[in-house]
């Protein structure tokens, strides 16, 4: 059970780092915020992607351009299935794929992946995994590793990873 909790905590940390740029720890008598130094300019607040009329392509274009202007070439877009479904129902994306003849037709995942790759050079990845935890009052609740309404653009290695997780003894443990 303890090892499962450690693995879950690392997944929570990764999800928070990718979706927020910070990691919040408020458990086991700790209350701390670890800031990974994501520049404020990179924390873009997009418009309402739940509105089928909203210009989602414009948001993606703005984020990709900002990164490219800084010499960074994003290769992945990480988000939730909720945001993916909003993209599939978006009229601008539907028109880009089907033209105006099939307006309102739901975009398939293959079509969405294809147009996002073609237009922006991005592979789509999703994270909808959840974990359960017990609150201080004893109630059991579920949390998400990656925030549902977020979209993260990043550069991944060939395997799709961003960064490396290191496991090993702490300096204190190494003294033994």
Model-identified regions with their sequence ranges:
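Functionally constrained cores in energy, signaling, and assembly domains
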Residues: 1, 13-15, 88, 157
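Long, hydrophobic/aromatic-enriched structural stretches that serve as scaffold segments
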Residues: 1-8
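Intrinsically disordered or highly flexible coil/loop and linker segments, enriched in small
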Residues: 8-15, 72-73
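Short, glycine/acidic-rich hinge or "gate" loops at secondary-structure transitions
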Residues: 12-28
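Extended, solvent-exposed, turn-rich assembly/linker loops in the middle of proteins
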Residues: 31-111
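Sequence/fold signature of self-assembling virion shell proteins
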Residues: 94, 99-176
